[in-house]
């Protein structure tokens, strides 16, 4: 097993920015995933999961969206820190191309310090 950390360039946190990063751009910052090993990627922002999966992360652990700040039953998170309504990867487990993403709602809040139907969360992941 190999654990990689990826620091997303600041331009990807700007409001109204396109929501895609290529695997090639990720490779410019961190090494290629190791062949024959289970590769875990720590990436703060889950919005770019497709790029992380194409890079080769078997499992990506992420947060940033704070569960969507407030949550609606049957709908999920309402707004992201980038002011995007109904973010796709707000909280929970997702899969793409056979790769997994785990997103926690986290313990803190964003610039608006409130949570509605969105309790603080600490995620414990067991690997075996």
Locate each region found by the language model.
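Soluble catalytic domains of enzymes that build or remodel membrane lipids, polysaccharides, and related
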Residues: 1-128
């Amino acid at each position: 097993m190999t654990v990689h950390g990826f620091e997303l360039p600041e331009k990807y946190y700007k409001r109204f920015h396109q929501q895609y990063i290529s695997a090639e751009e990720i490779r410019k910052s961190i090494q290629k995933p190791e062949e024959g090993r289970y590769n875990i990627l720590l990436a703060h922002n889950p919005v770019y999961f497709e790029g992380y999966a194409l890079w080769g992360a078997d499992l990506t652990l992420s947060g940033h969206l704070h569960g969507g700040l407030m949550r609606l039953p049957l709908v999920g998170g309402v707004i992201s820190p980038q002011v995007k309504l109904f973010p796709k990867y707000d909280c929970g487990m997702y899969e793409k191309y056979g790769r997994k993403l785990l997103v926690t709602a986290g313990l803190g809040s964003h610039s608006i310090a409130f949570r509605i139907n969105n309790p603080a969360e600490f995620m414990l992941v067991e690997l075996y």
